[in-house]
Structures are given as C-alpha cells and as structure tokens.
Regions:
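ATP-dependent carboxylate-amine ligase
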Residues: 1-138
Length: 138
C-alpha cells in the first residue's frame, strides 16, 4: 500500500546479529517487526534470542520509531527487547497477523521485518492474501 518494506529471516544469534548490524547502519527512521515462533521447523528452543544483540536495535535511539512483535512467542520477544533497552512505549504486541499488517501498512517509515522461518511463511502468506501479488515461488 505504498509503505516500503523488507523481510530478513532470523533464526539464530549469528544471523540475527548480522541483520542488526545492517539495520543499525541504515541510520534512518524505521519501523521494526520481530516475529518469533518456536515450531519444529524453527527449532523449539528460543533461548538464542538472549544471545542475539538486540541491544544494537535499542541503541538506534530516535531512529527506532516502532517495534512490533508477533508470533507464537511474541511475549518472550517483547521481554527480550525490554531487557535490551528498547523503550517500552515503542513496543507493541500483535497476536494476529492481520492487525500487524494493517499497522505495517499505516507506518510512515520503512518497515523491516525479522521473522523466524515459520513466521516468515505465515506472514508472507497473509501479506500476499491482503495485499495481492504472486506467491514467492511463482
């Protein structure tokens, strides 16, 4: 709907840290989305989020306009971001992807989505359904 967005898969501390380095280097206002699932295909142990450098996200300061969290383990992700130092007024939890997509589309800032594997599949399917477009593999 006109809001630029980019989706970057995160599934372990190393990959997540690379994504954080990239995002911190953008030096621009943005909305960030973290979707955390713990299904078999993701790996059921999400303790890796405590090893990932989400403090780098918090250090973005005023450029960090909003952080939306979603997925099966959204509450765990919210807690991790709180301990990383992200201002809690910037964190919003979405337990369903449809209102999350509405919020992303309403963002006046570029949206950077960081999902785990099954969250990526779920969210991509919902985005395609709501916004149109072909499936990724078509």
């Amino acid at each position: 709907r006109g809001t630029p967005g980019r989706m970057m898969l995160v599934k372990n501390p190393a990959g997540c840290n690379q994504t954080m380095r990239y995002l911190a280097g953008l030096n621009e206002d943005a909305t960030f989305v973290v979707c955390l699932n713990d299904r078999d295909a993701d790996g059921t142990d999400i303790s890796w989020i405590w090893d990932a450098d989400f403090e780098r996200l918090a250090a973005m300061g005023e450029h960090l306009r909003h952080v939306y969290v979603s997925g099966v383990r959204a509450d765990d992700m919210r807690l991790r971001l709180k301990y990383a130092g992200v201002d809690e007024v910037r964190i919003e939890v979405f337990y369903d992807y449809d209102p999350l997509i509405d919020a992303m589309c309403a963002s006046e800032y570029p949206v950077f989505i960081m999902p785990t594997y099954t969250a990526m599949l779920d969210l991509r399917g919902r985005l395609q359904k709501q916004l149109g477009g072909k499936e990724f593999w078509e």
